[in-house]
């Protein structure tokens, strides 16, 4: 029997800004014939995910949860500790239900590009400054719970030099999605 996966997250899981065929999660699903349930919702925060965790994860009885959260929290000026606490609650809940957990560390953003192409906001700098801290805290969680992870932040750390991978400074275009797919396939292949 093949594994059932739930991918829980925000627009970075959903595939905002690209056709479904170009979304990295859908590429994993079709390339490797995986049973993946994409529970990415545009704009979702870790608090939102916590609220819908029972319905979107536990009630689907997956073997494996891929969880990536934090960007929208930071774009809402929420502290990293709040994000990490929410993610840890979801990790514990999944593990207590015999669900293996993989963590996704969100990619970097390009504040200037986001201000120009997504929407004007004074929170991009806060997000940009705190993504490295979130990355470190998520790596600590992965170590504490012996979890597998994909570090999309390190992949896009020099985001300004990789602006050709972004739709709007936050969301990745088909080329960026393909980079996430190539990185993620090592964990799922």
Where are these regions (language model features)?
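Serine-esterase "nucleophile elbow" of acetyl-processing enzymes
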Residues: 1-48, 52-61
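Alpha-helical cap/lid subdomain in secreted, periplasmic
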Residues: 31, 51-189
